[in-house]
Regions:
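Glycine-centered structural positions embedded in regular secondary structure
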Residues: 26, 57, 118-120
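Glycine-enriched alpha-helix->loop->beta-strand junction motifs that scaffold or abut catalytic
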Residues: 50-56
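Beta->alpha turn/N-cap motifs
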Residues: 60-61
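Metal-dependent polysaccharide deacetylase catalytic core of the NodB/CE4 family, i.e.
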Residues: 1-45, 55, 68-75
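A sequence-composition feature that detects small, non-aromatic residues
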Residues: 19-22, 57, 97-99, 136
Length: 164
């Protein structure tokens, strides 16, 4: 499948409809559940997917689902050769969702150089640690009572970047 973030809206609609026709033909089944190719979505893609009749959609950021989650961008955990060890599976089973709100930036795909992000949560701020997937140095600010802001201390690289 193509990465939807690299396609025009018309191409996205065409590809999804084509895939649905293939599923219907081969499985005699219509699904109202969508999984973003490569696990990547943005606000515009989410609107398109919803307009095509999908009830929920899965992205690929790791978290448990919590009440109030964006149902067009639900998290899922990767399980494959690299991320499929039993110890990791046990850790996931024992962990809990980090419910967040007032997230900035609102979109998950950022096409410009930005210096940070933030969110609010009802969890204890001192129990939260943040890391960048490409070892970019960052600074975390805990703003009482429930706000966490992250600032990058060096430029982020082009391409896929994740904060965990």
């Amino acid at each position: 499948h193509s990465n939807l973030n690299k396609l025009s809206n018309n191409e996205i609609i065409y590809k999804i409809k084509k895939a649905n026709k293939s599923i219907q033909k081969n499985l005699n089944f219509n699904s109202d559940i969508f999984s973003y190719p490569y696990g990547e979505s943005n606000l515009e893609n989410e609107k398109i997917v919803k307009s095509l009749g999908f009830r929920i959609a899965f992205s690929q950021h790791s978290n448990h689902i919590y009440r109030g989650e964006n149902i067009m961008r639900l998290p899922r955990f990767s399980f494959n050769e690299e991320f499929g060890k039993l110890d990791r599976f046990k850790m996931i089973l024992e962990s809990k969702a980090l419910a967040v709100y007032d997230v900035i930036p609102k979109d998950t795909i950022i096409n410009s150089s930005f210096i940070g992000m933030g969110f609010s949560t009802n969890h204890k701020l001192n129990s939260i640690n943040c890391f960048h997937s490409n070892s970019v140095k960052l600074e975390t600010f805990r703003i009482p009572p429930n706000r966490l802001e992250i600032r990058f201390l060096e430029p982020i690289k082009k391409g896929r970047n994740r904060i965990t």
